[in-house]
């Protein structure tokens, strides 16, 4: 049995065992999603609070827990009818004891849509049946798990993405069926022990997100779930996070075609991520980030987990650099935010892959100047309108930034980037607005991206992170967006009526439009209108 499935099975056993026993919690655990997280903006980004906001997912406790309970209990209907209570107010199964809580929900996600612009005019649909369970024991143990069985027909551009990457975006391996149908499973599990108000340990099959933006140039929640152990420490104004991850990349080749066919991979990789966040005051926060990725096997043979990286200190670079022939991929980064107004926060990131001072400031397009930048602003109650939240963001990455000399040790997980979905060699501007009123939720998103892709002969232009940086054609004269020029315009609008906020059961209607103009090629155009009965808080990234 795969480690992730074994872990999930053990967690589900614990859930049932404790949930049905006779055992009011003060903490909650839930996967991260932007659309849910933005509802906490007035607490997270208020100049009256001093919370660590950039390491996600985080536990809901104290004022966040109060807000969580408020959001999931709002608009209760007064009814003694069991069906009406379960439909509008309660979890399907709910246990609230003095020192523990337990809940279980069925999560339907049914959607049907129609392609209005693309020439194939296909009917799109999603048929998902899921379960979620949550358990707390006093204020020490928190557990969350979900499982989804899915079939779907996607728009053309997502169909093409899955054909190349062999995954549903952010949700793992996909099986191709007839007539464009896809079949896949998706699961999440997270078990946290809270030693005190200062230290937490989490074992999870989930994702992580470092940053205050919608995207992250450091570590994002875009790729599929992976098994990891996370330590979080909070002392005064300092929060420290250390993550040790076991990841899969089954698509990666097992042989190095550039080195006489030497073996360098078995589809397994490891990662260590450290993040140190310091709240200077109520308005300013600064964080330091570093990561290292290594293959489970390389030319020297089986390696497994490297215990040199078990050191929880934020000093991985010296450890890695002591090995002059290190096959590991290393990154360092900076994350910062400043609450410029009562209801607006500016944020940013800087990622550094390689640095040579002479070349970095030389302005000569040196290929090994590998960096990425994010700048953004987000806020709440825009124009004095209660619950009108917003975000505007700019992201850029130099060519070759996330590549490595072999793809198994690049900055990816299960065939997708660990940072920005576009990989590298791009500029991107995006904006998101969310508004909630009574039981209604509205969202509007727009994205513009200019990026370069590889030509037909496969020359490495720096955007495809699965290429080897040993195949860089020109060491100098490189620029962002080089290669085949692409211009992407994406817009998405949704309106939903929330039936049950406990598990986000909602009636939803939406329209998604995507135009991609490719140099000297026919433009790719798509416009899909959809309606559905949806639930859960999981993210699905189709905006790429």
Indicate where each model-derived feature is located:
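Short regulatory "switch" loops immediately downstream of catalytic or recognition motifs
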Residues: 1, 14, 247-250, 449-452
